[in-house]
Amino acid sequence: MVKVIVAGYKGRMGSTAAQMVIDNPDFELVGVYDARSEEQNLGEDDRFKGQNVPAFHDLDQIKTDATVWIDFTIPTAVYENAKFALNHGISPVIGTTGMTDEQVAELQKLAKDKQVGGLIAPNFGISAVLLMQFAQQAAKYFPDVEIIEMHHDDKIDSPSGTAISTAKKIAEVRQPKEQGNPDATETLPGARGAEYEGMRIHAVRLPGLVAHEEVMFGGPGEGLTIRQDSFDRISFMTGVKVAVEKVNQYHELFVGLEHLL
């Protein structure tokens, strides 16, 4: 039985993760945390009536025997949350994006020092993991590429962690290249999107969307588009479940769900 605490349970991803833990007979939800809440018990939330699980709204309050910390909070909170988990011997499974490379490196060092496993996943959807792998393969042959990520309009950070991770994987194998006409101008600033290693990333925010990404490659006389769609947040729970099951087997902090698959 894996004992789990879920951080960010008031949000849509966090509440979905909490329900996944409750529904899984191999997991036990032993606590929830959300700095926005003043509830003392998860059962006070209308979505979780009948559940008797301690709820915390301050890290200093947390007393738990959890071995896994699922985090779907916000970019400004996730780093401190992950440090708290690692310092208490709890393996973090982090779906919150927005941390800097320096923060990730510090967490990886802390995990190694504490001999605690952990995972930071820009995306827990299996289709998104496959998209990144396929895009990396295609980039060996198509150095001209643009990334378009599309999310719901409540998403705070842009571009998405998945788009950045996709760009990093492409950059590992792509021939260095500055795309487009070197004399090109923008009538409206930002029209060509954000620049990363010579390629462009575009972020779309609209109501009705959940999480979607297209990677478009172009070559002489041909093109290739790889697309992934998450239509419901439940699609991410397969990856979260895998992470919860496996993360305690390791003694380091991985970045990317593919390391556990």
Swiss-Prot record:
Family stated for the protein in its record: Belongs to the DapB family.
SUPFAM superfamilies: Glyceraldehyde-3-phosphate dehydrogenase-like, C-terminal domain, NAD(P)-binding Rossmann-fold domains
Entries under NCBIfam families matching the protein: dapB
Biological or metabolic pathway of the protein: Amino-acid biosynthesis; L-lysine biosynthesis via DAP pathway; (S)-tetrahydrodipicolinate from L-aspartate: step 4/4
Keyword terms of this UniProt record: Amino-acid biosynthesis, Cytoplasm, Diaminopimelate biosynthesis, Lysine biosynthesis, NAD, NADP, Oxidoreductase
Protein name per Swiss-Prot or TrEMBL: 4-hydroxy-tetrahydrodipicolinate reductase
EC number assigned by the record: 1.17.1.8
